[in-house]
Amino acid sequence: MTAEKPGLHPRNRHRSRYDMNALCQSCPQLQAFIVQTPAGEPSVNFADPLAVKALNKALLAHFYGVTQWDIPEGFLCPPVPGRADYVHHLADLLAEDNAGTIPPQATVLDIGTGANLIYPLIGVAEYGWRFTGSETGKDAYASAQAIVNGNEGLTRAIRLRRQKEASDIFNGIIHKNESYDATMCNPPFHDSAETARAGSERKRRNLGQAEDGALNFGGQQHELWCEGGEVAFIEKMIAESKLFARQVKWFTTLVSRGDNLPPLYRALTAVGAVKVVKKEMAQGQKQSRFIAWTFMDDAKRRKSF
């Protein structure tokens, strides 16, 4: 009997334990990182960033057909199952406005797509959506573009735009006469470099990693922290979203802590959001959520742009 990971979305391909043999066939370089658990089952050392990156390569190749994927050293290596959950729950939200059917040609904007390009890769493979990914960092942008260029078919489904103004979110990215069914975002969580380092250190201790061990909790400044932390970033996003109220059906963003929700709800009320939705998610013991808001009523959202 195959054990299931509790809480993951019913359509998530990662509900069952990893079949390491199948993953190694899809990505032979994973084989070098396979270790045995105390129960004698094959696994990887999740405190080893190279092992985690190899596992991600294998997952993306095996489940999503992404054969060319890499990220530069020091960038975030995302947990694929949790990222996939956001995509699937967003699909459910869009289906509610489409007579219960997930729209196959949805257009989605991924804010801060990152060097890993994880949300567009999953969204294109699972639902055939078309993505625009924004990115502020030059190296992250180049990495994401290399992934697009290296995989057949992605150049028609994913386009990237460089956000040249670090203080802007939608400004300069959503062009005049463009429209999107939804936006996505995994915002920076910490409010300073110091708290980001402390958070990485806590995770490292939880895995029993030596103090001088390589971090699997990498990340560039813009990936991990911003002035004012997550709440300030999302409040800025909410304020800017009002400017594009007629061009986007649903604005969405992850919110790492439930404690951060009250000020965000107040900000959404202040800008006149017509409807606000919270989608709860869970990956094992970890609880997460995203909020979605719109300036369109139900009838308008159900019409095509």
UniProtKB/Swiss-Prot annotation:
It is found in: Cytoplasm. The keyword Methyltransferase applies. GO terms for molecular function: 23S rRNA (adenine(1618)-N(6))-methyltransferase activity. It is an enzyme of class 2 (transferase). CDD domains: AdoMet_MTases (cd02440). Transmembrane segments: none annotated. One of its GO terms (cellular component) is cytoplasm. HAMAP family: 23SrRNA_methyltr_F. Belongs to the methyltransferase superfamily. METTL16/RlmF family. This is Ribosomal RNA large subunit methyltransferase F.
